[in-house]
């Protein structure tokens, strides 16, 4: 049977569900808060005007592409730390965490420079009104300054979650979400003596929130008694290029996979610019709501990575394979809820972002497409996270490349422009690409986990 789901008793299945839930639920709530920050940005920008919403849509697409790609690279820390923790290598856990912080800081600085360099080419490439162009540039400048803090935060996030302490992440994320609301209000609309920055104010709020999150999570870990034996904050460690090389080897394919998936969504925003601001704004609604729901498989997948990595560290290879299957089944059950939510409530959901009739009409149809790809999106996400627990990252990268670009973005462009399907052509192709990715990744996980069990002669 697929992933040996019939290997253990139903009581073991329920136990694994409980363990996954204990990890995934705080991660989910943390994701709710983090994605909610983007939701607040979109709503606040929409309240300032259609042009501000379009500017934030373009600027956030650029920021999200860099952030998500680099976040994927930092995700290498999860299986590394989880496997060390499972093997009982306490000192190595702390040292790997320190090196992760160094690596995140350097990566974040590079991301900041990269975003600075991208501002002028974007302004020259896109045909936009002066207001949208200027607001987009300001937004990108502000969010670029968030990159170093964002990557340090991801290192600390991986450290805490891999040691089965996601509650700290949840608390910091909710504090950041609460802080983001008044900051957006002040910067976007010009309150308490601040100038009204419009959509650019969302970028300034994002910068402040990321720096707060990194500092708060560091303080939590330093003060929490559970973390003291690992010694993350007990001493200063110099950058270790050997560890950096290991992080890069595992993380670079993950980052590229993230980029390929994120760019398939984000790049569509730029390709839709010639259709007009209504389509760009509607696309942002679709991306925002899809992102909010995507946090569910991400949370289940992250929990699966930790549980699989921990089991492999303990050399429980058959258990790791079983956990992979339980993670997928959990995702399939949850996908039913998200499908129904998007299909049944697509019009009210779209109206939360903007009240322009043209935008609402397009966005409601876009959300119907988003609902249709939920099951396959959940599947490909959780399967790729499970493979990450095995430190298998290159094959998923190639699968994502073929699926999202070869079967998604390029056919979507043809459907949109050659067959006059417009925005719906892109979403049709995305459904096909996610389906292909899901099938390929599940099959890869089946083969990888089975071979791991066989090679270690686990009965």
Spell out what each predicted region is.
Residues 28, 32, 36, 40, ...:
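Generic alpha-helical transmembrane segments of integral inner-membrane proteins
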